[in-house]
UniProtKB/Swiss-Prot annotation:
Name assigned to this protein: Calsyntenin-1
Pfam family, one: Laminin_G_3
Glycan-linked positions: N356
Xref: PANTHER family: CALSYNTENIN (PTHR14139), CALSYNTENIN-1 (PTHR14139:SF4)
Principal cellular location given in the protein's record: membrane
Gene3D superfamilies: 2.60.120.200, Cadherins
Name of the encoding gene: Clstn1
Reported modifications of this chain: Proteolytically processed under normal cellular conditions. A primary zeta-cleavage generates a large extracellular (soluble) N-terminal domain (sAlc) and a short C-terminal transmembrane fragment (CTF1). A secondary cleavage catalyzed by presenilin gamma-secretase within the transmembrane domain releases the beta-Alc-alpha chain in the extracellular milieu and produces an intracellular fragment (AlcICD). This processing is strongly suppressed in the tripartite complex formed with APBA2 and APP, which seems to prevent the association with PSEN1.
Side Cytoplasmic, residues: 852-952
Subunit structure comment from the entry: Directly interacts with APBA2. Forms a tripartite complex with APBA2 and APP. Interacts with KLC1.
Length: 952
């Protein structure tokens, strides 16, 4: 009975122990269940001279394990971040309260705020600190509050200013102080104060000083002010500043340091026109200045200085294709249809033609060959005014007879430019564009303008001064009906073929009128033709042009400069230069004008700068002297003239150009009145544009003579040639060496030289369309008619009566240089002349000897037979002489020509006097005999012809 309760007790004990064990485990597991908790963000403020940070919200870490000991307590805070000068301290473990404090002295001027993260951790499960749990990371922003520890400091040690008397200045100068504190409250300067009493000046909160009354230079020349500054924390500057304000007498604003006359010497490059100019603003505060410099060149040439070559040459220089026909060329032997037109009467600048409403020029047939179906270009310089509403024709192609149809025409109507182009007859009879209208101020503003029409049916493009313009109106018309009537091209009016009179006369000035068929004018060519050779230039050094805006007009005649800094603007103005790139510019005045606009901070008191007017005097360039030299007189055999090569007219031609300069005396003799300036001639190089070879005397006969040149060589040189009955004209802008080479190639041919004794030619070269002319270089070529000397001697031996013709032929050559047998020799040397004369004289003596022997023989025969031929009163009775009447006439004619030639040669060629004299002496010996040959003299007296006894 007692044993039964034992198992039940044991079971209860086991259950109790198990319950105790189970309950204790649950309690232990619930000791540190939760992590500490912090606010996500904290904002703090700390003063730079304190170390405690005031946080919002306060730093308190919460733990749900509270109030358990250890697990519910906060043991510390941990700060995360690099170089964070703060640490966090737990004030109360049970409440989790803590503080953040700085570890070192903070400086707001170095760093104004800090940002870092912080974590809280509890005490763990027990005193050993195991099982510690950490909160999430919270962000902390801390701002360092400034302390007014720095006083204001002025930027400058002293200030200076100058003002003009008698003005109320809105601001004379500004004093400025700074504060090193970091906060806006203590770093800003809130006020300035003038400490000097009884002065007529005030200073505002921004530091601007102005006068309270008008200053008087006579009363006070200079004021000295002491000025201090306060920051917004009322802290005064430790050091006050001294301000000196000078009073200046009344000032006149404007440009100073410029000269009204600037002399420009040609060929010197760019010339600074305002090297010492500066703008006097009379110390007015200037916000900006705009200065416009204008060069007035409208009175020079066609608006400015340009090359004055012929328009055809200018087109070639600008790269235009060949085929340009010039309708208003300078008058010459080859282009003479503009002779009657009034011109500018000078060659210093472009040659222009004036039309007064009653004049017109008929263009010869063949000058222009135009196919309206193909592209073509019309180019012209025009100056025209508002002369009313009548049509005024520039260029017109119309029917020559029977009808008044206009085929194409360029005319003005008021301020409109109109181009008419009627299509040629075609199978399609439908309307086509025929009349193109442009309304432009340039047509009637009385200034020179350059007009270029690019015609490519059905469109026409107009360029005025290089700017393209589309027609505002295009009128259509039917093509012309077919006829066989020729057309007449006229400049300055339009020919009415049906009425046989001119109409629609032009009033104005024209120049450079050209027509070119084929390829249209390129824009680069058009710009090149319009570009001026003179203008204003501004080359600013690398360290300059700071803050200065520069604008240049397309014509280089207007420069506009704008800048805020007057000093920098002055530097830019001092670098403005005048440049004329022509070797021989047009002399005269180019007016200069400066207009200025000044903007001030206080526009009510802004200054006005009066305009400046001056001029550039382009001096007369040293006039070049173009000299042509070479052989003036030579003779050639007739066979050379008749050969295919002909005779070179200018084989040794030399072309040089020189200028004469005045050389000032050296410094030692500059003050000596007896020392005079010396003239020095120096050779220069420039181009030529024309060389004209004309024949003197009768015009060239194309049936028997010509002037020829290798055209292929000319094209390589870029030179054109025009032939006429008067000679040839070479045109094209090329070097003197090129023209020299071309003239060496010019040859004269004559394939009927029997009646030709000589031919004379004249050569003149020019530069700049006749502005500079060379000397007249004259050449005389003689034709030598010769026979075979051996055959002639035999003939004379057999026929003594021909001695006199041979003698005459020899005399014909006296006074001339005998031709060298070498085809390239120009003038035979003296030795050659002597040899030829000696050989001729020897032949003559042989013939004379034969004649005398025969005469002696005849005299012996006569003595033997004295009864025969008693009627003859001379010894050579047996001699029968037959005289050719034609030879007698030729002898007389030749003798007259011989005397004239000898007289001309004695006056023209003094260097040939020796040859002439020797030839005359030989001739006289033949006619009269020498002083030592008395027998010959007697014989000559005996040989007196009795024409009555001669039988023909």
């Amino acid at each position: 009975m007692l044993r039964r309760p034992a198992p039940a007790l044991a079971r209860a004990v086991r259950l109790l122990l198990a319950g105790l064990l189970y309950g204790g485990g649950v309690w232990a597991a619930r000791v540190n269940k939760h992590k500490p908790w912090l606010e996500p963000t904290y904002h703090g403020i700390v003063t730079e001279n304190d170390n405690t940070v005031l946080l919002d919200p306060p730093l308190i870490a919460l733990d749900k394990d509270s109030p358990l000991r250890f697990a519910g307590e906060i043991c510390g805070f941990k700060i995360h971040g690099q170089n964070v000068p703060f640490d966090a301290v737990v004030v109360d473990k049970s409440t989790g309260e803590g503080i953040i404090r700085s570890k070192e002295k903070l400086d707001c001027e170095l760093q104004k705020d800090y940002t870092f993260t912080i974590q809280a951790y509890d005490c763990g499960k027990g005193p050993d600190g195991t099982g510690v749990k950490k909160s999430h990371k919270a962000t902390v922003h801390i701002q360092v509050n400034d302390v007014n520890e720095y006083a204001p400091v002025f930027k400058e040690k002293s200030y200076k200013a100058a003002v003009v008397e008698g003005k109320q200045h809105g601001s004379i100068l500004r004093v400025e102080a700074v504060d090193a504190d970091c906060s806006p409250q203590f770093s800003q300067i809130c006020s300035y104060e003038i400490l000097t009493p009884d002065v007529p000046f005030t200073v505002d909160k921004d530091g601007y000083i102005k006068n309270t009354e008008k200053l008087n230079y006579g009363k006070e020349h200079q004021y000295k002010l002491t000025v201090t500054a306060y920051d917004c924390g009322k802290k005064r500057a430790t050091e006050d500043v001294l301000v000196k304000i000078s009073v200046k007498p009344t000032c006149s604003p404007g440009w100073q340091g410029w000269s009204s006359r600037i002399e420009y010497e040609p060929g010197t490059g760019a010339l600074a026109v305002f090297p010492s100019i500066h703008l006097e603003t009379c110390d007015e505060p200037v916000a900006s200045v705009q200065a416009t410099v204008e060069l007035e060149t409208s009175h020079i040439g066609k608006g400015c200085d340009r090359d004055t070559y012929s328009e055809k040459s200018l087109h070639r220089l600008c790269g235009a294709a060949a085929g340009t026909s010039e309708l208003l060329p300078s008058p010459s032997s080859s282009f003479n249809w503009t002779v009657g037109l009034p011109t500018d009467n000078g060659h210093d600048s472009d040659q222009v033609f004036e039309f007064n409403g009653t004049q017109a020029v008929r263009i010869p047939d063949g000058v222009v060959t135009l196919d309206p179906k193909e592209p073509f270009t019309i180019s012209v310089w025009m100056r025209h005014g508002p002369f009313g509403r009548k049509k005024e024709t520039i260029l017109c192609s119309s029917d020559k007879t029977d009808m008044n149809r206009h085929h194409y025409s360029l005319y003005v109507h008021g301020c409109r430019l109109i181009f008419l182009l009627r299509q040629d007859p075609s199978e399609e009879k439908k309307y086509r564009p025929a009349e193109f209208h442009w309304k432009l101020n340039q047509v009637c503003d009385e200034d020179w303008h350059h007009f270029v029409l690019n015609v490519e049916v059905p469109s026409v493009t107009l360029y005025v001064d290089g700017v393209s313009h589309e027609p505002f109106s295009v009128t259509e018309d039917y093509p012309l009906h077919p006829t066989k009537i020729e057309t007449q091209l006229v400049v300055g009016a339009c020919w009415q073929g049906g009425d046989l009179h001119m109409t629609q006369f032009f009033r104005g000035n024209l120049a450079g009128l050209t027509v070119r068929s084929g390829k249209l004018a390129d824009k680069k060519v058009i710009d090149c033709l319009y570009t001026c050779k003179e203008g204003l230039d501004l080359q600013v050094p690398e360290d300059g042009n700071r803050g200065v805006q520069i604008q240049t007009s397309s014509s280089q005649a207007v420069l506009t400069l704008e800048g805020e800094n007057v000093g920098e603007l002055d530097k830019a103005m001092q670098h403005i230069s005048y440049l004329n790139s022509r070797q021989f510019p047009t002399p005269g005045i180019r007016r200069l004008k400066i207009t200025s606009t000044v903007k001030c901070f206080n526009e009510a008191a802004c200054i006005e700068v009066p305009p400046v007017e001056g001029y550039v005097m382009v001096l007369q360039p040293e006039e070049p002297k173009i000299s042509l030299s070479g052989v003036h007189h030579f003779a050639r055999a007739a066979s050379e003239f008749e050969s295919p090569e002909g005779v070179s007219l200018f084989p040794e031609l030399k072309i040089i150009s020189t200028i004469t300069r005045e050389v000032e005396p050296e410094a030692d003799g500059a003050e000596d009145p007896t020392v005079q300036e010396s003239l020095v001639s120096e050779e220069i190089v420039h181009d030529l544009d024309t060389c004209e070879v004309t024949v003197e005397g009768e015009e060239l006969n194309a049936e028997q003579e010509s002037l020829e040149v290798d055209v292929a060589r000319l094209q390589q040189k870029g030179i054109e040639v025009n032939h006429s009955d008067l000679g040839v004209v070479f045109t094209g802008v090329e070097t003197m060496a090129s023209y020299e080479e071309v003239l060496h190639l010019l040859r004269y041919r004559n394939w009927h030289t029997r009646s030709l004794l000589d031919r004379k030619f004249k050569l003149i070269c020019s530069e700049l369309n006749g502005r500079y002319l060379s000397n007249e270089f004259k050449v005389e070529v003689n034709v030598i008619h010769t026979a075979n000397p051996v055959e002639h001697a035999n003939h004379m031996a057999a026929q003594p009566q021909f001695v006199h013709p041979e003698h005459r032929s020899f005399v014909d050559l006296s006074g001339h240089n005998l031709a060298s047998p070498h085809p390239f020799a120009v003038v035979p040397s003296t030795a050659t002349v002597v040899i030829v004369v000696c050989v001729s004289f020897l032949v003559f003596m042989i013939i004379l000897g034969v004649f005398r022997i025969r005469a002696a023989h005849q005299r012996t025969m006569r003595d033997q037979d004295t009864g025969k031929e008693n009627e003859m009163d001379w010894d050579d009775s047996a001699l029968t002489i037959t005289v050719n009447p034609m030879e007698t006439y030729e002898d007389q004619h030749s003798s007259e020509e011989e005397e004239e030639e000898e007289e001309e040669e004695e006056s023209e060629d003094g260097e040939e006097e020796e040859d002439i004299t020797s030839a005359e002496s030989e001739s006289s010996e033949e006619e009269e005999g020498g002083p030592g040959d008395g027998q010959n003299t007697t014989r000559q007296q005996q040989l007196e012809w009795d024409y009555s006894t001669l039988s023909y």
